[in-house]
């Protein structure tokens, strides 16, 4: 018989740097999960993606065991990295803060493809372009 799911926790953590300190500690500690075990497994699974923010969905079961699924980094993080920015525009429609090329958009779309609700690379590129525009990043050819 399948284990009963008690909770699903969504976090965004830096790859390879999960520690029992907040936000991991409070989110998982109150559900009785062994924090050090989670941190070791997460850090091992994301060691090759150092420096990136990785969304993770942790499923906690009744017997205090857990499983987790890592996703691709958020599009906003990848766009900021491509445009060499620290943050997006405070006024996205009026003030552009950076530029990315269509080739960079295509690279990001290929990375994000498995997490996006898109059937082909063109649709994924349009989604990423929309994210860029909402951050005040201009898309150039």
Swiss-Prot record:
Keyword annotations: Methylation, Ribonucleoprotein, Ribosomal protein, RNA-binding, rRNA-binding
InterPro entries for the chain: Ribosomal_uL11, Ribosomal_uL11_bac-typ, Ribosomal_uL11_C, Ribosomal_uL11_C_sf, Ribosomal_uL11_CS, Ribosomal_uL11_N, Ribosomal_uL11_N_sf
Post-translational changes noted in the entry: One or more lysine residues are methylated.
GO molecular function, one term: large ribosomal subunit rRNA binding
GO biological process: translation
Entry superkingdom: Bacteria
GO cellular component: cytosolic large ribosomal subunit
Leader sequence residues: none
Transmembrane segments: none
Classification via Pfam families: Ribosomal_L11 (PF00298), Ribosomal_L11_N (PF03946)
Protein purpose: Forms part of the ribosomal stalk which helps the ribosome interact with GTP-bound translation factors.
Family: Belongs to the universal ribosomal protein uL11 family.
Subunit structure and binding partners: Part of the ribosomal stalk of the 50S ribosomal subunit. Interacts with L10 and the large rRNA to form the base of the stalk. L10 forms an elongated spine to which L12 dimers bind in a sequential fashion forming a multimeric L10(L12)X complex.
Annotated protein name in UniProt: Large ribosomal subunit protein uL11
Phylogenetic lineage: Bacteria, Thermotogati, Thermotogota, Thermotogae, Thermotogales
Gene this protein is translated from: rplK
